Regions:
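Hydrophobic beta-strand segments that make up the repeating blades of beta-propeller
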Residues: 1-5, 54-58, 110-113, 162-165
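Short, solvent-exposed loop/turn segments at conserved positions within beta-propeller repeat blades
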Residues: 7-10, 59-60, 115-118, 167-168
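Beta-propeller blade termini
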Residues: 30, 39-48, 86, 95-104, ...
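Calcium-coordinating acidic loop motifs
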Residues: 18-20, 45-51, 59, 70-72, ...
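Generic short N-terminal amphipathic or hydrophobic helices
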Residues: 11, 23, 63-65, 96, ...
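A short loop-to-beta-strand structural motif that recurs across blades of beta-propeller domains
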Residues: 11-15, 63-67, 119-123, 171-174
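Blade-edge motifs of beta-propeller repeat domains
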Residues: 16-36, 68-92, 124-144, 176-193
């Protein structure tokens, strides 16, 4: 399936994949209202129920809209396929959003960076199966105008680290993951230029 943000329409469109072998096709889109000016989306199972949910960074809304998937397998896809969104407060102008289990507790956390704030925020997942919730964000200082976010294990310790591109500085901020189960923490940024 495809999930696409619509910045000017304040919604996200989801296209159900109806492809068969050798033929690409999608069902008519279903739109879901978000906060102001959704910019990026990440897709993952956020409540460990085996279904893919999505989280949307709302640029002018200074928020994240989280949509819990309630669809049943092979059913027709409708506006009822996702629960009413959960909204998380963020700093102004969130841009890039990624999902990963940063603290190793088996739940998918969220990381987001901002265009006008020099921070990356991490929201620790406190969800239970069928109910999505997140703890208050933890903020980590970046360089100037951290515009894009990448995640991955950069040092081979089996923990997901964070890298942020800093537009004004022409640098990259790298954050080594020092989290333990239930607690999200990262080292002070290492700046690459």
């Amino acid at each position: 399936d495809l999930a696409v943000t619509n910045y000017g329409s304040n919604n996200i469109s989801v296209f159900r994949n109806t492809s068969t072998s050798g033929t690409v096709s999608f069902a008519t889109k279903v739109d879901f209202s978000t906060g102001l000016n959704p910019l990026t989306v990440t897709v993952n199972d956020l409540d460990n129920d085996g279904k893919l949910d999505f989280a949307v960074a709302n640029y002018w809304g200074s928020s994240i809209s989280i949509f819990r998937n309630t669809a049943t397998a092979n059913a027709s896809f409708t506006s009822a396929s996702f629960a009413t969104p959960t909204t998380l407060s963020a700093l102004a102008n969130p841009r890039s959003i990624k999902a990963a289990d940063f603290d190793g507790n088996g739940k998918v956390d969220l990381a987001i960076c901002y265009v006008t704030n020099n921070y990356v925020s991490v929201f620790r997942n406190t969800s239970t199966t069928g109910s999505i919730s997140y703890a208050t964000k933890a903020d980590f200082a970046t360089g100037n105008l951290g515009t894009w976010l990448a995640i991955g294990d950069l040092n081979g310790d089996a923990k997901t680290d964070i890298a942020v591109t800093n537009q004004t500085d022409n640098t990259v901020s790298v954050f080594q993951n020092t989290s333990t189960s239930g607690t999200v923490s990262f080292s002070t940024q290492v700046v690459l230029s």
